[in-house]
Amino acid sequence: MNTARRLALAGPLLLSWLLLVPAATRAEDAPEKAAVAAADAWLKLVDAGKYGASWDEAAPLFKKAIGRADWEKALEGVRSPLGGLVSRKVASRTYTESLPGAPDGKYVVVQYATSFANKGTATETVTQALVGDGRWRVSGYFIK
């Protein structure tokens, strides 16, 4: 087989491979993107001071760990001194099926580089769990 014919046959194969790799990467990113979108929506509740509503939207594992009234009180004590949100950007997102102290499942740990009116630099960590209803729900929230 001559070189021109080999290139003519290899070209479409290479092109199809190049098109499939980004599609596979997009498919792998899909759970992480959905989890980040859900975390963003949940954080909007927290930013608006709707702490009870944020508890309502949390994962069952989260609700087992802390009652609604205790969550509202704890979040009020942590978030109020920080002041209003100035900026928030996703710093990292990591998919895992195992977390310390949690049952095996599908999780995405999202870290945000955040700035508040009274705290210039903070790291917010929102752990999302894929729950029985097929939705990503918060199973952990930490501010550092």
What residue ranges belong to the model's regions?
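Exposed beta-sheet edge and beta->alpha loop/turn motif
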Residues: 93-144
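N-terminal export leaders
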Residues: 6-14
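Short solvent-exposed beta->alpha transition segments
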Residues: 36-38, 52-105
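Short, low-complexity N-terminal intrinsically disordered segments enriched in polar/charged residues
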Residues: 12, 20-50
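N-terminal secretory signal peptides that target proteins for export/translocation
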Residues: 1-5
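Second-shell loop/turn segments in exported
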Residues: 28-29, 40-43, 57-64, 113-115
